[in-house]
A protein has these predicted regions:
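Polysaccharide-binding surfaces and accessory modules of carbohydrate-active proteins
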Residues: 1-92, 134-166, 293-301
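Short Pro-Gly-centered flexible turn/kink motifs
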Residues: 10, 113-131, 365-368
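Catalytic cores of carbohydrate-active enzymes
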Residues: 17, 28, 32, 244-245, ...
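Trp/Gly-enriched beta-strand surface patches
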Residues: 33-117, 173, 177-180, 184, ...
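Low-complexity, Ser/Thr/Pro/Gly-enriched N-terminal "stalk/linker" regions
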Residues: 154-201, 225-228, 232, 325, ...
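Aromatic-rich carbohydrate-recognition surfaces in CAZymes
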Residues: 218-334, 359-362, 366, 449, ...
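Non-catalytic C-terminal accessory modules of carbohydrate-active enzymes
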Residues: 458-463, 476, 488-493, 508-662
Length: 662
């Protein structure tokens, strides 16, 4: 939209511009992209007949304006040795209408505008694609007219307002409200789950553990999607119990690896979905397995398209198979094998000879087994529940016997038996996720839990830079080879920078311990809005302050600089930290309660929770002397829970917590 406020007539051009990829990498595909123009609609078209999976598809770019100039030649548009900062086309009145094969393909449409003083103008550009030429042109025709664009934009706004309305908060911290009420769910659902793409990585693949974690963060806003994704992931499990590390739809090509944690996210996810929704029917859904050749000892993994297996099983059976595999692949200390990396893919050579063991994975497996006990009992499988109890207890004993280093928990053991994340190490003496998950899993004895988090806070929280390191000191000169993590500059990304995923887990662990001061301190460090409060901070952080960044650098001269924004799973975990760990949402089926971990200076906050067509409006105060009280529409609820009813009503909930000390 343009509004001429200059006080005189202006002659302008509005130019819409796209660069065609039509494949995975533009450098590979551009020689195969052929462009043309449909004379009836004026749409510029592009196709890549050599695309392995999408050879028949065609894309279009067009506008409703008349008298337009256009070109499909990027060289013509930007000029020789030119750039998009100052395209050569802007120095000419008309584009040269070049199209066909053998060009550096693009689509540029130049709309001439003549605006008298006070005039307004609106130009709409459309970008789309169809399965073939006929469908593409039909789509282009059906979307002609400015009203189509306006209606589509309105529909998008209505959709997102509906999704984001599930949980809304009003707290004394406006930076928290901005993230919790919109940006984090939008980042998780829009970028991570639907697009699976970002400026730092435009991949499009489903990562088994990656999008499962995203879907679990969406269980309040989109439980249907969480359910659907559990079944999708189960359909990418091999008959041996391992899974595809990632795959590209729609064909399903991807990688099979010896990564040791992927498959355990399936039972972990099933447990969370049932804990929150109470929907046990998903466990009886029947899903097929896949088959493929085994990963050889000489490989970390291989890329291929698996074949569907004749074997099928319920989601419950898929989860059990994953747990059995996890409990079978143990090392000499009775802890899970590291394989070609656990959650930290960069530690891909710690245990690639199938002898190295992962302490973090021991905590994670214990947590998953512990959660599965209740699920198995509810499913009527008491023997499996007992088996989970025995396996979890064995893991707990082995972790407490072998993993404690004296002041914190170790991270792993190399294939040769050397420890990692130990005071014996010159590099990576302490790793964050072993400390946080020792608490989150319930393994650590109380005194060790406190000491482990104290060590994390002392050694990894950088108050000067407002960041939380993943590990310290970074890998640099060590004789042991941990893997490709050492390829990062010390202090960057996983190699000693802030890896925000792990930073959030640290804050969650402090909240679980009831340490509100440190939990909120760390949450404030992670919140990107707090890294852009003044021009100096903006110049330090240098990335978008409204979405989570996967990394914050911890090495001079880039200390405090963010990296890898948007496409990071830390967004979903940050959402869970804010609305669950800190503001205290606890939903168990049709029961909802709040158990917040609040700063002492907060007198109150408000929270709205949507259940179906109903809304529950919480007002949380802190004036109670003695026991907390909860009223729903004035009626006392002795168990401090709210019964959720999908009846279209607005319920008023008053929760009065005990007054803070002092």
């Amino acid at each position: 939209r343009l509004h001429n406020l200059s006080g005189r007539t202006r002659r302008l051009s509005a130019i819409g511009y796209v660069e065609w990829v039509m494949g995975d990498l533009r450098a590979k595909s551009r020689m195969h992209v052929v462009t043309e123009r449909d004379h009836q609609t004026g749409a510029l078209l592009a196709r890549n007949a050599y695309s392995t999976d999408f050879g028949g598809r065609m894309a279009f770019f067009d506008t409703d304006a008349d008298g337009c100039g256009w070109t499909c030649d990027r060289l013509e548009f930007i000029g020789r040795n030119g750039s998009l900062h100052a395209p050569a086309a802007l120095r000419r009145e008309r584009l040269d209408s070049r199209l066909g094969a053998g060009l550096d393909p693009c689509a540029a449409i130049q709309v001439p505008l003549l605006l008298a003083a006070g005039d307004r103008s609106e130009t709409t550009f459309r970008l789309g694609a169809g399965r073939n030429r006929k469908e593409t042109l039909a789509l282009a025709r059906s979307r002609q007219g400015a009203h189509e664009a306006i209606d589509a934009l309105d529909a998008v706004r209505i959709h997102w307002r509906n999704v984001l309305a599930t949980v809304q908060v009003r707290t004394p911290d406006p930076a928290l409200d901005a993230l919790a009420n919109g940006w984090l769910v939008y980042q998780t659902l829009g970028c991570r789950y639907l697009a699976r793409s970002g400026y730092y990585q435009s991949g499009g693949a489903f990562g088994f553990r990656d999008q499962l974690q995203d879907a679990l963060a969406l269980v309040h806003a989109r439980p249907d999607l969480t359910r659907e994704h559990l079944l999708l992931c189960a359909a990418h499990q091999f008959t041996e119990g391992d899974v595809m590390h990632w795959w590209h739809p729609p064909q399903g090509r991807g990688v099979r690896t010896r990564c040791s944690d992927d498959y355990l996210w399936l039972p972990q996810g099933a447990c969370r979905y049932l804990e929150v929704t109470g929907d046990a029917s998903v466990l009886d859904e029947v899903v097929g397995y896949i088959e493929g050749r085994a990963v050889t000892p000489e490989e970390e993994g291989y890329y291929d398209m698996p074949t569907p297996s004749t074997q099928r099983g319920t989601l419950y059976a898929h989860c059990v198979l994953a747990l059995e595999r996890g409990c079978r692949l143990l090392g000499e200390r009775g802890l899970p094998l590291m394989g070609s990396g656990d959650w930290n893919d960069g530690m891909n050579r710690v245990g690639d000879q199938q002898r190295g063991e992962s302490v973090w994975l021991g905590f994670f497996l214990h947590d998953t087994l512990r959660r599965f006990i209740g699920l198995a009992n509810a499913h009527g499988d008491a023997p499996r529940a007992e088996w989970c109890q025995q396996q979890a207890e064995s893991l707990r004993q082995n972790l407490e016997q072998h993993a404690w280093d004296g002041a914190w928990y170790r991270r792993a053991w190399f294939d040769n038996g050397a420890p990692l994340g130990s005071s014996q190490n010159q590099e990576c003496r302490i790793d964050s996720i072993s400390q946080s998950w020792s608490v989150l899993s319930g393994v650590a004895a109380p005194e060790r839990a406190t000491q482990a988090l104290d060590s994390l806070y002392t050694h990894l929280v950088r108050k000067d830079a407002q960041l939380i390191q993943l590990l310290d000191p970074p890998f640099d000169q060590t004789t042991e080879d941990p893997g490709y993590i050492r390829g990062y500059v010390p202090g960057v990304r996983e190699n000693g920078g802030q890896y925000t995923h792990a930073a959030v887990w640290a804050a969650m662990a402090f909240a679980q311990q009831g340490d509100a001061v440190r939990a909120w301190e760390l949450a404030g460090m992670i919140n990107p809005l707090n890294h852009a409060l003044d021009p100096e901070a903006v110049q330090t952080y240098r990335v978008e302050p409204y979405v989570l960044a996967a990394d914050v650098y911890a090495v001079s001269p880039h200390v405090g600089r963010g990296g890898w924004t948007w496409y990071t799973g830390s967004a979903g975990w940050m959402y869970r930290l804010l609305v669950e760990s800190l503001l205290g949402i606890r939903r168990e089926g049709d029961r909802l309660s709040l158990a917040p971990c609040l700063p002492d200076h907060w007198p109150s906050f408000e929270l709205s929770y949507r259940f179906g067509r109903s809304f529950y409006e919480f007002v949380v105060t802190r004036t109670a002397q003695g026991q907390a009280t909860l009223h729903v529409d004035g009626m006392l609820q002795p168990d401090l829970t709210v019964l959720l009813r999908d009846d279209g009503h607005h319920y008023r909930v008053a929760l009065d917590l005990c007054a803070p000390p002092g």
